[in-house]
Design a protein with these regions (language model features):
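Extreme N-terminal starter segment of soluble prokaryotic enzymes
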Residues: 1-2
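Acetyl-CoA-dependent GNAT
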Residues: 5-79, 83-84, 96-98, 102, ...
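C-terminal "cap" of GNAT-fold acetyltransferases
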Residues: 6, 109, 116-120, 124-157
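Short, conserved glycine- and acidic-residue-centered signature motifs
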Residues: 34, 92, 146
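Conserved glycine-rich acetyl-CoA-binding loop
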Residues: 60, 83-97, 104-106, 111, ...
């Protein structure tokens, strides 16, 4: 397994993986049309100062993680997914550590994320990584997201 920065030729695999996990596994009913960032990853992430990392195994996308730059040393963690058969093998942790290294290196101070309430295993991961659950009223900066009974987490570096 290797982790690389986003490449355009991986776009469809990325979309397929994310939509499958969101809609088939988590059943949150979030169509591609409500995720314009997936249709133009380069513009929404890379060109705006963020990053989009991809875990690859034998040429196949098996995981993703990204962050969007929200200015003033603020970032939003996005699109953190690992294909079901590769979970609990350290791939998610490797993706997270690599992205966290980029965030620290670039001087980010606050990392926000939203996650569906039904994805309980991910909540444990975030809490173990130092994220604290917050309310909408505690958002440290303006952030809009497709709320699917979502929980918000914040990490202060």
């Amino acid at each position: 397994m290797r982790i690389i920065s986003y490449r355009e030729e991986l776009k469809q695999q990325i979309i397929d993986l994310i939509l499958h996990i969101q809609n088939e596994e988590a059943k949150i009913n979030l169509p591609l049309q409500q995720q314009p960032d997936l249709l133009d990853i380069r513009d929404f992430y890379i060109s705006r100062g963020g990053e989009f990392l991809v875990a690859i195994e034998n040429g196949v996308v098996i995981g993703t993680i990204a962050f969007m730059n929200y200015g003033d040393h603020n970032a939003v963690l996005k699109k953190f997914f690992v294909q079901a058969e590769y979970r609990s093998q350290g791939i998610g942790l490797a993706l997270y550590k690599k992205l966290l290294g980029v965030l620290v290196e670039q001087g980010y101070k606050k990392i926000l994320l939203d996650t569906p309430a039904v994805t309980v295993k991910s909540h444990h991961f975030y809490e173990k990584a130092g994220f604290k659950m917050i309310s909408k009223q505690e958002l440290p900066f303006h952030y809009e997201y497709p709320d699917r009974d979502s929980l918000l987490y914040l990490l202060v570096l």
